[in-house]
Every structure is written in C-alpha cells, then in structure tokens.
C-alpha cells in the first residue's frame, strides 16, 4: 500500500486534494488555536491530530497559535501545559509559537479601517442592553441609538477606549452589519471590549482586547493559513469570518471548514463542568487520571500512540455523534497488549504457605517479559515457600467453571510449580488468613510426570521478596453514558471510579519509572504514578482492564 493510500480520508482531505489539483494552493498551512484558559482534553486531541496530521501528510505547515484575547481567564501555566501536550502527542509546530496578541497592533489598525469605512461604531449600551437589543431567533434585533455616529466621532471614542477613558462595560466597538439578520452572529457583533487586566504576553500595554471572531480570521490571514478548521459550533461564525476579511485590506482570505466535535461516553468535555469537578474537589486536579484531559490520560498510562490511533479511528465528519468509551479503551488495550512488559502483582493478597517446600530457601524462576515477543527478553523472579496470591484465586468449594485453586485440588503457579490446597486458617470473623498447600517439586515450568491435567494458572509474589505497593484502581468517572444530560451531572459520579488497594508486586517493579506501562498478569495494565510515588512508596495506576467489564455489565 502506498503512503497516499494509507492516509485517512475524509471530506476535509478531499477539499485539500481538490485545492492542490486545481492549483488554488501549492502548500497547505493549518493551525491549532487553543485559548490558554485551561488544560487540553481528548476533544482537543482530535483537533491536534487533524491539523498537525494534515500538515504532516501534505508536507505542509501547522502553527500552534494561542488565542490569547482575554487576559482575565488566561495564564502562562496553561500556555506551558498546552505546548507540552502537543509535543507529547508527537507533533511539532512550524517556526515559533504564535500568539493572537502578536497581532494586537494590526488588529487595532484593521478596527480603525472598519470605522473609517463606516462599518464599525462605538456603542455605549450596557452589556445587558446589547443582549436585549440583539433579539431572538424569531425576532429581529433593534438598532442601538449610538449606531449612526459619524466616522470622526467613532474614531475619537475608539481612541478614548484605547487610552482608558471609559470604565469596563461602558463602551465597546461593534461591527455595523444588520440587526435584522436571520443569523444572530451577524447582528452587529462586538469587535472590541474594555478590560483593565494585565496580559501574560503584552503586560499593561492594552486595555482594549479584540473578540475571538474578529481576531481569529485576521490571525489566520496574517499567518497565511489555507484551511481554517473549526468544530461545528462555529458554523454560523463563518459568515462573520468572511465578512471581516471581505471588508478590510488584507491580501489573503483563508476559508473556514467545520467538523464535528468529539463527544465521548462516561465523561464531560465542557470546560465549565471540568472546572467544577476540580474546584469542588470531586477529582484531585486537572491531571487526575479519571479526567479526560490529556495530562490526566497521560498520568493514567495512556500512550500518545493510542490517542492518535483513537483519533484516526473515529475519523472526521460533519455529523455530531457520541463515541463509546470502549473505543478509546480498546486503543490503549491493543497498544499495551503489544508493547507492555509483563509483571506480577497481587492486588487483594492472602498468604499461601507451601508446607513441603524447603524451609527458608528460595530460588529464581525465569519469566518472559512478553509471551509473544522473545526479543523483549526475560527476567528472574524469586520464588519461596511463602507467597501471596489474590484472594479471588482461592475457594473452599467451587463448580467446574472455576479454574483456580480449590480446597483439595491443584493449580499451576505461573511459570513455577503445581500446588495443591490442603487446609486453611481463618480469623475470628471467618476470613481466610492463610492457605496451606503442598507442591509437586518435579513440575517447575512443566506438566506433572504422571500425565494428570492441571488446568488453572494463577499469579503470585514471593512473600519474602515482595515489594509493597499501593494500587489505584481507576474506572470511568461517571456511572451513566451521558452525564451531561443529567439534571445534576455531579449526582452521577461513579462512586467506584477510584478504589485504593494495598498489595504486593514482584521486586523488579522497584525499578519502574513513571509513565512506563506494565501488564500485571491476569489483572490489567498499570503504570507508576508520577504524583504519589516516593522512594519509600510505589503507587501504580490502573490504566485499563484486560477486557471491557462495562460491556458485560450492560448486557
């Protein structure tokens, strides 16, 4: 298959192919323009993969541009986080990072040009009055009483705005379009508002700041963007995008194209709702492993490759739809099944004593790091007469479907011996505290010599060599597929979204590094946590289970 055939295809790429074939463009130039007022989430990853992926596939350029026109909500912390997320996903922007604030002087000059042409005016209605005058979808708006000021008066008032002569909310600059337009976005939209706030890039140079719709199209044009890709909620805004560029003296007129945003089950994408989760401490921060933020997914153990694969699979369309969480989980599960080394950890431990094993002795058992990849090598794991097994791997009585350890029957310890359960000890409440077994010394990594069949295999950790670990079992943050539709989305938070266990792991995991994934055999995929791990305490996060347990629960 050729490189071109291997590329994903969608309506945007078809437009680009036509533009290149017709000679309309010879180089493709896209951009990713986040506002630095929060952390990026999986929905932004779709836009990142689309814009940077197109530039990559067509040997073009993609800018990273911060839409930093509201200093009240923005912070350099978010700028740094966004840059880190884009790079972590595996993409690189063209040249230096761009900022809309880089163009404040040009934007101001274009605003003056619109005033000079009689296409913009300074309005002194209050924000509430502007909303009232705007009308509704069924009713046209009303002209502001300040709409017909002369060009000279508007120029003087706009300069007064710029030099701090008005208080916040007392004046704004509006485009003069059509208050009866069927599209509310075209009813004399605000182009500039007053904000006495220090900007993280320009300091206190400005006290007037341009609105998104005015800034976005001009920034695209100044950067030579050929295809401006936005999500569907900006579809009506395209009319204003084109109006601004049609009415100023600028040589380049990019085109805006809209695609559906990413909606994902069992989570929320609204910045307001995500912020509420953080500020009300329902989660521990923006990088909480249950959050849909890129930093949260990264801390949970998701790989950049799995997120890119997910964005590739869901594709790009004009139709809004909701993607199953299982689709995202299958991407990371497939990635880690292929690439994660194996290790053993016992999450809910109970002691197993092998009574006929040489007392006080131990031995090393060789285990492959990956069952299907000999090139990943092997490791030596200590084995002894006292081990930890998972409590769920033993029953005093069980039916034939239970393939683990049962009283009076045998089971294989992974890559070690066959053991037989002989008796148990219990505490005062009747809980099993110790399982006593015997072992067949001739079954190290081989079948019993007499040909008897031992079907079950369980994992284990040598008690004398065990590494105490905290294991954080993360699950879906919400208990319903569409929490955003709930009357109170906080009421449907999954109470089991985080369960903390104290367990034991094989000693090789002492050398685990944050972010590196492992398959804990028979348990799932885990990675060392970057926040809570210390030299004395190893904390592992569950990235995803070995299979989709939610699908079974929903049947």
Curated annotation (Swiss-Prot):
One annotated GO molecular function is: ATP binding
What is catalyzed by this enzyme? tRNA(Gln) + L-glutamine + ATP = L-glutaminyl-tRNA(Gln) + AMP + diphosphate
Q: Which UniProt keywords apply?
A: Aminoacyl-tRNA synthetase, ATP-binding, Cytoplasm, Ligase, Nucleotide-binding, Protein biosynthesis
> Interaction with tRNA: where is this region?
317-324
Q: Which InterPro entries match?
A: aa-tRNA-synth_I_CS, Gln-tRNA-synth, Gln/Glu-tRNA_Ligase, Gln_tRNA_ligase_bac, Glu/Gln-tRNA-synth, Glu/Gln-tRNA-synth_Ib_cat-dom, Glu/Gln-tRNA-synth_Ib_codon-bd, Glu_tRNA_lig_a-bdl
Question: Where along this sequence does the record place binding of ATP?
Answer: 35-37, 41-47, 231, 261-262, 269-271
Residues forming the motif 'HIGH' region are: 34-44
Binding positions for L-glutamine per the UniProt entry: 67, 212
Q: What is its main location?
A: cytoplasm
Q: Where is this motif: 'KMSKS' region?
A: 268-272
The UniProt entry, under Pfam families, shows: tRNA-synt_1c (PF00749), tRNA-synt_1c_C (PF03950), tRNA-synt_1c_C2 (PF20974)
Return the GO cellular component terms, semicolon-separated. Answer: cytosol
EC primary class: ligase
Q: Which GO terms describe its biological process?
A: glutaminyl-tRNA aminoacylation; glutamyl-tRNA aminoacylation
Indicate where this protein resides in the cell: Cytoplasm
EC?
Answer: 6.1.1.18
Subunit record text: Monomer.
Show the HAMAP family listed in the entry.
Answer: Gln_tRNA_synth
Concerning its family, UniProt says:
Belongs to the class-I aminoacyl-tRNA synthetase family.
Concerning PANTHER family, the annotation shows:
GLUTAMATE--TRNA LIGASE, GLUTAMINE-TRNA LIGASE
Task: Report the protein name in the record.
Answer: Glutamine--tRNA ligase
């Amino acid at each position: 298959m050729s490189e071109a055939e291997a590329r994903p295809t969608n309506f945007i790429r078809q437009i680009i192919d036509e533009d290149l074939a017709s000679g309309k463009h010879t180089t493709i130039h896209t951009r990713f323009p986040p506002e630095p007022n929060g952390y990026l989430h999986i929905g932004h990853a779709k836009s990142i993969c689309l814009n940077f992926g197109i530039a990559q596939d067509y040997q073009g350029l993609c800018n990273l541009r911060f839409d930093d026109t509201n200093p009240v909500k923005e912070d350099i912390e978010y700028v740094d986080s966004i840059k880190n997320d884009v790079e972590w996903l595996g993409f690189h922007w063209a040249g230096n990072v761009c900022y809309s604030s880089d163009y404040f002087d040009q934007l101001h000059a274009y605003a003056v040009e619109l005033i000079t042409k009689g296409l913009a005016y300074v309005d002194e209605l209050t924000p509430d009055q502007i909303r009232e005058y705007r009308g509704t979808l069924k009713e046209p708006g009303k002209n502001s009483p300040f709409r017909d000021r002369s060009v000279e008066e508007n120029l003087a008032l706009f300069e007064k705005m710029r030099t701090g002569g008005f208080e916040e909310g007392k004046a704004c600059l509006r485009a003069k379009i059509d208050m009866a337009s069927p599209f509310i976005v075209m009813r004399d939209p605000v182009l500039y508002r007053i904000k006495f706030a220090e900007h993280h890039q320009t300091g206190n140079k400005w006290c007037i700041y341009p609105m998104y719709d005015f800034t976005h199209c001009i920034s695209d044009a100044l950067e030579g963007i050929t295809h401006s890709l936005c999500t569907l909620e900006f579809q009506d805004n395209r009319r204003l995008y084109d109006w601004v560029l049609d009415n100023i003296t600028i040589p380049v007129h990019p085109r805006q194209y809209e695609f559906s945003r990413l909606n994902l089950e069992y989570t929320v994408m609204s910045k307001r709702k995500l912020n509420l989760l953080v500020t009300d401490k329902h989660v521990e921060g923006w990088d909480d492993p249950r959050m849909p933020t890129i930093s949260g997914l990264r801390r949970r153990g998701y790989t950049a490759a799995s997120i890119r694969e997910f964005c590739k699979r869901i594709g790009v369309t004009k139709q809004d739809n909701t993607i199953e969480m299982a689709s995202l989980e299958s991407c990371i599960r497939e990635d880690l099944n292929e690439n994660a080394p194996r290790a053993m950890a016992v999450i809910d431990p109970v002691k197993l004593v092998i009574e006929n094993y040489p007392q006080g002795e131990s031995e090393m058992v060789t285990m492959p790091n990956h069952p299907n990849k000999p090139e990943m090598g092997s490791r030596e794991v200590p084995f002894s007469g006292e081990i930890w097994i998972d409590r769920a791997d033993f029953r005093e009585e069980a039916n034939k479907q239970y393939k683990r350890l049962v009283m009076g029957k045998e089971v294989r310890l992974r890559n070690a011996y066959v053991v037989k359960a002989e008796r148990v000890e219990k505490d005062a409440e009747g809980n099993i505290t110790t399982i006593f077994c015997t072992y067949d010394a001739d079954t190290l990594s081989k079948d019993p010599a007499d040909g008897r069949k031992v079907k079950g295999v369980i994992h284990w950790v040598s008690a004398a060599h065990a590494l105490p670990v905290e294991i954080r079992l993360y699950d879906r943050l919400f208990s319903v597929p569409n929490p955003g539709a709930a009357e109170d989305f906080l009421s449907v938070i999954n109470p089991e979204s985080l369960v903390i266990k104290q367990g034991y792991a094989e000693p090789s995991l002492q050398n685990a590094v944050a972010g590196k994934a492992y398959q804990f055999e028979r348990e799932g995929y885990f990675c060392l946590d970057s926040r809570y791990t210390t030299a004395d305490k190893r904390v592992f996060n569950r990235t995803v289970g070995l299979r989709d347990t939610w699908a079974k629960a929903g049947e």
